[in-house]
Curated annotation (Swiss-Prot):
Major site of localization recorded for this protein: plastid
Record localization: Plastid, Chloroplast thylakoid membrane
Gene that encodes the chain: ndhB
Quaternary state and interactors: NDH is composed of at least 16 different subunits, 5 of which are encoded in the nucleus.
Keyword set, alphabetical order: Chloroplast, Membrane, NAD, NADP, Plastid, Plastoquinone, Quinone, Thylakoid, Translocase, Transmembrane, Transmembrane helix, Transport
Entry protein name: NAD(P)H-quinone oxidoreductase subunit 2, chloroplastic
Superkingdom, natural source: Eukaryota
Positions of transmembrane segments: 11-31, 38-58, 78-98, 112-132, 133-153, 167-187, 219-239, 256-276, 290-310, 318-338, 348-368, 389-409, 422-442, 478-498
Catalysed reaction, written as an equation: a plastoquinone + NADH + (n+1) H(+)(in) = a plastoquinol + NAD(+) + n H(+)(out); a plastoquinone + NADPH + (n+1) H(+)(in) = a plastoquinol + NADP(+) + n H(+)(out)
Membrane topology: Multi-pass membrane protein
Function in brief: NDH shuttles electrons from NAD(P)H:plastoquinone, via FMN and iron-sulfur (Fe-S) centers, to quinones in the photosynthetic chain and possibly in a chloroplast respiratory chain. The immediate electron acceptor for the enzyme in this species is believed to be plastoquinone. Couples the redox reaction to proton translocation, and thus conserves the redox energy in a proton gradient.
GO annotation, biological process: ATP synthesis coupled electron transport; photosynthesis, light reaction
EC number(s) per entry: 7.1.1.-
InterPro entries: NADH-Q_OxRdtase_suN/2, ND/Mrp_TM, Ndh2_N
Organism whose genome encodes this protein: Staurastrum punctulatum (Green alga)
Length: 513
């Protein structure tokens, strides 16, 4: 390994967005140690994340990407850059959500921001990781930071419980994932890079000798299947797909709400990027078979997530099961497996970022003013805070896919890609479960919009009405306004978004590894 090549200027420019975040992270750490004043810490983190986002957008429109860096351990292409951009954007939106929450809950702001930036860095490196070691190190960077973020409310026993559950189940899933990596390493003859693993496996006699044959049909190497199942468990945990979702409701309910907002978008985006890269590169030999397995996982996620969400009484638990169902929708894009499918996944994730973070922003605001997240306690909110009730309604209806909101157009393109790839069962399931989701989303909207004063909940009766919510200088309400606008109008710009995404992937040869 040549040190000069490893730390060349070209390599450093490749990870310039990550370098910006590292500088911001160290700056926050030094300021906290020296002055203990946290006035500018959020602004520094937000500036760093926005700067990284703009750099990534510039790289996305630059046709000279589509290569590997750091001796082949980091892949640079349009797909990678788009997902890294989604991560920085979601983290940037989480900072306004957290400012007031941190002050009220007694959390340490510097600690929260450092962990958030570290988790973002781990997710960004994970999106571009091109060898097994880089994948695992990046995944653990994201995971360990997420475990600590979940337990940030140290005085809240629910947060401590959520952090412990997340740690135990996350550690178990990581162990299974590494076991799958060990099978790939052995089957390939000691290769680490993903493309070399495929070549190594196909050239080994063990691949043919361990093939499973049923009725004359070859089902690939048994060892390769073991690796696939282990990797599916690890990635399924990360994206909250059934049946690897058990941690999601408890962790979402117990963790600080700004942390949950990040986990629902950032962690899912990084996991989907990893799943797409691994499945499309490493397992082409058993593609027909793993498609069947992934179709079952997507089907169960959509059905189970929406049915259980309809029975929830807590807003955060409802959004947790909603997140599980969203994972099922997004798996359709991986199964499509072409530029249209990947473009639909990125576009829907962009829309999902705004509408989901908008819903969590409303949950944060209502929780700070009332101290509850029970759905029944939202009854009559429109009479006290019309703007908050309207904003939450827009975000929830967009999540349900109601036209003409952005969520409708995102799902429409996603399902259209699935239909074109003959995934009829999943498309029908997605349509039916989207209708089911209307029930529990509209239940919240109906409760908020009631005009009967006598039906107003006790918490809403004591609700302190803000003076000018829409034009408030509060960072969380400014962030909420941005999310509501994006959830409302982003769908009208679907064609330009899709064209840019598809073009960047085709130009950068994402589909040719």
């Amino acid at each position: 390994m040549e040190t000069n090549q490893l730390f060349s200027l070209d390599n450093l420019i490749t990870i310039l967005p990550e370098c910006v975040l590292i500088i911001c992270l160290l700056t926050i750490l030094m300021i906290d140690v020296i002055t203990k004043k946290s006035v500018w810490l959020s602004n520094i983190a937000l500036l760093g994340l926005l700067t990284s986002t703009f750099i990534l957008l510039f790289q996305l429109t630059n046709n000279e990407v589509g290569f590997t860096a750091f001796l082949g351990s980091f892949q640079v292409d349009g797909f990678t850059i788009a997902f890294r951009c989604l991560l920085t954007l979601s983290s940037a939106l989480c900072i306004p959500l957290s400012t007031e929450y941190i002050r009220r809950s007694g959390m340490t702001q510097a600690e929260f921001l450092i962990l958030l930036l570290t988790a973002t860095l781990g997710g960004m490196f994970l999106c571009g990781a091109n060898d097994l070691v880089t994948i695992f190190v990046s995944l653990e960077c994201l995971s360990l930071s997420s475990y600590l973020l979940a337990g940030q409310a140290k005085k809240d026993i629910r947060s401590n419980e959520a952090s412990l559950k997340y740690l135990l189940m996350g550690g178990a899933s990581s162990s299974i994932l590494v076991y799958g990596f060990s099978w790939l390493y052995g089957l390939s003859g000691g290769e680490l890079q993903l493309s070399k693993i495929v070549n190594g496996i196909s050239s080994q006699d063990i691949y043919l000798s361990s093939a499973v044959s049923l009725d004359g049909k070859t089902f690939g190497a048994l060892g390769l299947w073991v690796a696939f199942v282990c990797i599916l468990v690890g990635i399924g945990f990360k994206i909250s797909a059934v049946p690897f979702h058990q941690w999601t409701p408890d962790v979402y309910e117990g963790s600080p709400t700004p942390v949950v907002a990040f986990l629902s978008v950032g962690s899912k985006a990084a996991g989907l990027a990893l799943a797409t890269r691994l499945l499309s590169i490493v397992f082409p030999a058993i593609e027909d078979q793993w498609h069947i397995v992934l179709e079952i996982v997507a089907f169960l996620s959509m059905v189970f997530g929406n049915l259980i969400a309809a029975t929830q009484t807590s807003m955060k638990r409802m959004l947790a099961y909603s997140s599980i169902s969203q994972a099922g929708y997004l798996l359709i894009a991986i199964l499509v497996g072409n530029s249209d499918g990947y473009a639909s996944m990125i576009t829907y994730l962009l829309i999902y970022t705004f509408m989901n973070l908008g819903a969590f922003a409303c949950t944060v605001i209502f929780g700070l003013r009332t101290g509850t997240d029970q759905i029944r306690d939202y009854t009559g909110l429109y009479l006290k805070d019309p703007w908050l009730a309207f904003a939450l309604s827009i975000c929830l209806l967009s999540l349900a896919g109601m036209p003409p909101l952005a969520g409708f157009f995102g799902k429409l393109y996603l399902f259209w890609c699935g239909w074109q790839s003959h995934l009829y069962l999943l498309v029908y399931t997605g349509l039916i479960t989207s209708v089911i989701s209307l029930y529990y989303y509209l239940r919240v909207v109906k409760a908020m919009m009631t005009k009967e004063v006598k039906e107003m909940s006790t918490y809403v009766r004591e609700y302190v009405t803000p003076s000018m919510s829409i034009f408030s200088s509060s960072s969380i309400e400014l962030g909420l306004t941005l999310c509501v606008l994006a959830s409302s109008i982003l769908g009208f710009f679907m064609n330009p978004l899709i064209d840019v995404t598809k073009q960047s992937m085709l130009v950068n040869n994402f589909l040719v590894f």
